[in-house]
Amino acid sequence: MESKLEEYILSHIDAEPDVLKKIDRDAHVKLLHTSMISGHLQGRLLRMLTRMIRPERVLEIGTFVGYSTLCFAEGLEENGEVHTIEIDDELEDYVRSNLALSEYGNKIKLHIGDAVQIIPGFEDGSFDLAFIDADKELYWEYFEATLPKIRKGGFILVDNTLWYGKVVEKVESSDRATQGILNFNERLAYDDRVEKVILPIRDGITVIRKK
């Protein structure tokens, strides 16, 4: 997105909460791969979608620093909860300290481990909303594991589905992340178990509704 247009958008939407500003700022100082953080625009979108869907339980695959996790928690009703899964155990203390900064941190349950192994332990149909934002090579596996856990009429959001525009470029066979995104997009397009639409926001977000 052009910088001037992005500045205009960010100045005409709800402000980024101070806690999230701090989490974003600290991550840029202390960590690598900070492009994985949702950021102001996408964060406000996630909160808005959560308030529209009004879920009781949210499942997030890929916590990273907890930014998007807190956006979901912020959008929940009083008794709602977010279950978030992070595979990198070295991030656990860092994430917990970030979640503790927010008044919504008590709505979040952090699971450390491989999502493909953790998700089957949840009851089928027990989540209203899920967010997939983890290893791109495994997107289809995450989706297949998650779909049974979503109630009928529930939603799955999938991040990065336009992947820096690489989805319309020639892709090297060695680019496994892009191949994973392409595989997910192609298979989802013909999956009649769900309704789906890709939003060209940031790096692409696919909104999926379970029939």
Q: Language-model features: where?
A:
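A short alpha-helical cap/connector motif
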Residues: 1-129, 136-157, 161-211
